[in-house]
Amino acid sequence: MKVAVLGAAGGIGQALALLLKNQLPSGSELSLYDIAPVTPGVAVDLSHIPTAVKIKGFSGEDATPALEGADVVLISAGVARKPGMDRSDLFNVNAGIVKNLVQQIAKTCPKACVGIITNPVNTTVAIAAEVLKKAGVYDKNKLFGVTTLDIIRSNTFVAELKGKLPTEVEVPVIGGHSGVTILPLLSQIPGVSFTEQEAAELTKRIQNAGTEVVEAKAGGGSATLSMGQAAARFGLSLVRALQGEKGVVECAYVEGDGQYARFFSQPLLLGKNGVEERKSIGTLSTFEQHSLDAMLDTLKKDIQLGEDFINK
């Protein structure tokens, strides 16, 4: 199993690479790519960790050597948020970066499962899909927007509020990956209930958690370590499913049946070919249903922005 991390010299990329070096199954290969010249050195640094995961780093304009034979590609390349920016302010820079890298994936490892971490995810996933489609290699079961950070934040905040162990809580999060499009299904957590006010306040905190980190870092960056953890969890789940493990379920932002929007985050059963089944989002509370209805315009506009970036 070969996993490639694109954007591996950045804050998310380094955290992700460290976790993968420690947690990928023995015999796996990990390849790191970034435009920054430090990348081969990051790989050398990580290569001293005593796990049976082969690691190699590549830098420069050409990601091809890193992508050859990859089963899973995780893209975290791009610029980070600064205070006062929202995820859509990143669009102008990051759209071009994602387009370029996905074009290289289409040429070099078109059958790989691709997880997009680069924000704004609502839009960058649509860009990736259109690039792959133009190249004639798009498989909607193999392209994912990584929204796992919303899930792990939800698990943490719910556990804090309700005095539970974070490992015992699993909150499904649907919709998209920014602002109002993030919708934690708090009504679906077994054995936990919320007042309407609690649900509204907690939902808002989960939606704004990224901004909480950006402001706390006072201009020094955005959520890199928790995002690295989230991306590693998703990447490792994907690897386990590709290797034939049954019953692996994760939420991610994928192209579905278009009931809500062309791309939508929902629980997925993962398998040997990527998405095996898009699972139902279940019964929503009145608050959740209202939030879902209210977000769809925003989500559809975000998606349209990505489609237009490639097709206009």
UniProtKB/Swiss-Prot annotation:
Short name of any one Pfam family annotated for the protein: Ldh_1_N
Catalytic activity reported: (S)-malate + NAD(+) = oxaloacetate + NADH + H(+)
Positions annotated to bind NAD(+): G7, A8, A9, G10, G11, I12, G13, D34, N94, I117, T118, N119, M227
NCBIfam families per the UniProt record, alphabetical: MDH_euk_gproteo
Family per similarity comment: Belongs to the LDH/MDH superfamily. MDH type 1 family.
EC number from the UniProt entry: 1.1.1.37
Enzyme class: oxidoreductase
Entry's Gene Ontology molecular function annotations: L-malate dehydrogenase (NAD+) activity
Residues annotated for substrate binding in this entry: R81, R87, N119, R153
GO biological process, one term: tricarboxylic acid cycle
Active-site residues, record numbering mapped to chain: H177
Subunit structure: Homodimer.
Domain of life: Bacteria
Name by which UniProt lists this protein: Malate dehydrogenase
An annotated GO cellular component: cytoplasm
Keywords, alphabetical: NAD, Oxidoreductase, Tricarboxylic acid cycle
Organism listed in the record: Salmonella typhi
